[in-house]
């Protein structure tokens, strides 16, 4: 993991840099956000995300990244509108998979981060005690109430830059406003 190498080099004074937390590769499910595996490419480790199938697979992946020395584990609970078949309103992981990730991360005193745009994925993150939620884009009154009840322990990162770019600068790449708004 390059993140770990860079963080260690900064901390050891080998290169100048800010305080830096090394993150895992994104953990996803087959067909979810970050799954870029293709049947003709035999190297799944080159995919943007690591695929898991079930709680034990999740546990294995999380342990592997923690062994490598990451500071945080990122899991993708929902999709995104620019991902065919995995739009923003989805919630991909089972509660057992999320619980396994949270248990392993908390046991080792690390952070867990989630990509959660759909209300179901935001609620799932909150139910499992996840403190750092990226996006939280599509919500409702119930979800907002849950977030407010947890306001002293959660941090929401809306990721405004990507939303702006999707709406205003992505058409040349085939992402129309209709696709971007879901």
Segment roles from a protein language model:
Residues 30, 76-182:
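Active-site core of metal-dependent hydrolases
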Residues 16-50:
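Metal-cofactor-binding active-site regions of metalloenzymes
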Residues 20, 26, 58, 76-77, ...:
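Long, contiguous hydrophobic alpha-helical segments, chiefly transmembrane helices and signal peptides
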Residues 13, 25, 137:
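Flexible, active-site-adjacent loop/turn segments at secondary-structure boundaries
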Residues 1-16, 49-74, 103:
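Alpha-helical scaffold segments that flank or form the walls of functional sites
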Residues 1-14, 30-41, 96, 128:
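Metal-associated gating/positioning segment near the N- to mid-region
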């Amino acid at each position: 993991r390059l993140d770990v190498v860079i963080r260690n080099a900064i901390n050891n004074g080998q290169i100048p840099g800010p305080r830096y937390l090394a993150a895992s590769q994104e953990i996803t499910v087959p067909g979810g956000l970050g799954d870029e595996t293709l049947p003709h490419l035999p190297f799944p480790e080159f995919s943007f995300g690591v695929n898991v199938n079930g709680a034990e697979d999740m546990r294995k992946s999380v342990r592997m990244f923690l062994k490598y020395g990451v500071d945080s584990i990122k899991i993708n609970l929902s999709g995104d509108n620019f991902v065919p078949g995995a739009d923003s309103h989805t919630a991909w992981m089972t509660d057992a998979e999320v619980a396994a990730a949270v248990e392993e991360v908390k046991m080792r005193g690390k952070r867990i981060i989630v990509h959660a745009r759909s209300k179901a994925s935001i609620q799932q993150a909150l139910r499992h005690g996840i403190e750092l939620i990226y996006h939280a884009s599509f919500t409702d009154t119930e979800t907002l109430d849950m977030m407010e009840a947890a306001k002293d322990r959660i941090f929401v990162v809306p990721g405004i830059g990507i939303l702006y770019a999707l709406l205003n600068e992505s058409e040349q790449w085939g992402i129309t406003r209709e696709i971007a708004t879901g």
